[in-house]
Amino acid sequence: MNELAGKHIVLGLSGGVACYKAADFCRQLIKAGATVQVVMTEAAERFITPVTMQALSGRTVYGSQWDAREPNNMPHINLSREADAIVIAPCSADFIARLVQGRADELLSLMCLARPIDRVPLLLAPAMNREMWAHPATQRNLAQVAQDGATVLGVGNGDQACGETGDGRMLEPSELLEEVIAFFAPKVLAGQKVLITAGPTFEAIDPVRGITNLSSGKMGFAIARAAREAGADVTLVAGPVHLPTPRGVRRLDVKSAQNMLEAVEGQAQGATLFIATAAVADWRVASQSTEKIKKDGSGQPPALNFVENPDILARVAQSPRAQSGALYCVGFAAESHDLLAHAAAKRLRKGVPLLVGNIGPATFGQDDNALLLVDEQGHRELPHASKRALAQQLVAEIARRLPR
């Protein structure tokens, strides 16, 4: 997906060993459809060469205010006026301090100072040693630069080049890309508190066996990311899946349907939008064996008695907050056939304003899907596309249905 198509990003590099990550970040920005103009400080050029960044960006790299290639000798004006955003990655402690002080004695800081502040946003990806990050001076400067209008993207935690471990690592290139895409996304869910369920549940039979399904959780995780990009505060209740948590999303891991119900009920009181994408098991064994059930040589299968699991969506949809309109509920239906008929019937049975249907066996575990939206007005198809693209479309569809 060319999610940054038409965007012109000025990528600034200040001095730090994390400059090596900027090379991959540059490539990912371009792959997402952006054009990238690289500007480097003298210190950055000690960690990675302008030749490398020029080869990756396909554009001449700027490093000096006194660049004869600019006819008017004003690269700080020319480059900043062309930008849709300026992203400093890595952004050193020194460079943050320079921004706070309004220093303008080299091209990159001068360009940040000269940018039209109401039109060209400034995004900072800090990178430094953990002690430098935690120092009161750095924290003061971060607060001030944010107050001055910059967006601080945060840092990672982990091993650092110095051999220490802690906060201060620059975010990974994929995380930075996710943040940039989120920054430009329309904030159609601003102010909403969104609760999402995703993935399968696992209903244990004995310590080594259980009942589950083929849901991968990919659709729910994609919706969580899209909702966060749309400005929502997102909590994701995830069944047993091995997927990375989207940036900025709070995740609660659960196993069984009962675990999921407890987590959802614990979060629903503060939510304004509930999206139930999880494929919750309909049944569980009445009594879980504490030991592995073994064959007894008779050839007869063990007798298993089943009880129905709680209907999480219906229970939330029937809650006082949902009935009053304070909590908007969206359900999902994974069917094997007769999708429209089953989805329409399920919407009425669950008591939700919007039901999203899909053919489960064809899409479980896949990266693409097609969706059918069913509400009281009728139905609408979202044609086959990546789950990422469908999640963005679905978030927009939900946003326009929310009570104002």
Stretches with model-predicted labels:
Residues 1-124, 129-404:
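A cross-family phosphate/adenosyl-ligand binding-site feature
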